Amino acid sequence: MAASPKINRREHILQCLATMLETSPGQRITTAKLAAEVGVSEAALYRHFPSKARMFEGLIEFIEESLLSRINLIMDEEKDTMKRCQQLLQLLLVFAERNPGISRVLNGDALLGENERLRSRISQLFAKIETHLKQILREKSLREGKGFNLDEAVLANLLLAVAEGRIAQFVRSEFKLKPTKHFNEQWTFIQQQLLQS
């Protein structure tokens, strides 16, 4: 029972950090500002996280757990190649849209000037997502005996770039241009092009 308040305080700190990333676009978040937002001293912050980098790692862990667990569900439950790709990309866009502050972490904007390890970890997350897309596209040729005219790795990179671009627009517009806006129409076009290849 004694560990419960610590977990709640840690979660509260991470929620405040995400909120500050959303409400202060383009601004660097200092531990002093975060402590004031949380309503504790900087020393109290450091009792829960040894460094600001660890706070960002906490957000990145949340991102990884949220996205990768849902991607695994998509991989298990959906067998149609195009639906899998659409659902994976839509998951990424909806997640960013519902978590504007965290979309700055996904985009790398909030990590400028922070520890290189954080940017590397986000890069690794996107590499994992791209690997899932490659797997989905490769499985099409195994299941149907017919692949695409373009290498699956090139296609996976293109699909992920579309999602990353939408997230970048969302961050750049200070969260006004929703990443999911026009996605269904754009996906219909992309799907037609993929199926023709």
Curated annotation (Swiss-Prot):
It holds the Pfam family TetR_N. Keywords: Cell cycle, Cell division, Coiled coil, Cytoplasm, DNA-binding. One of its GO terms (biological process) is negative regulation of division septum assembly. It is found in: Cytoplasm, Nucleoid. GO terms for molecular function: sequence-specific DNA binding. GO terms for cellular component: bacterial nucleoid; cytoplasm. Residues 30-49 bind DNA. Residues 109-136 form a coiled coil. Residues 7-67 form the HTH tetR-type domain. NCBIfam families: PRK09480.1. HAMAP family: NO_factor_SlmA. Required for nucleoid occlusion (NO) phenomenon, which prevents Z-ring formation and cell division over the nucleoid. Acts as a DNA-associated cell division inhibitor that binds simultaneously chromosomal DNA and FtsZ, and disrupts the assembly of FtsZ polymers. SlmA-DNA-binding sequences (SBS) are dispersed on non-Ter regions of the chromosome, preventing FtsZ polymerization at these regions. Belongs to the nucleoid occlusion factor SlmA family. Homodimer. Interacts with FtsZ. This is Nucleoid occlusion factor SlmA. The lineage of its organism: Bacteria, Pseudomonadati, Pseudomonadota, Gammaproteobacteria, Alteromonadales. The gene is slmA.
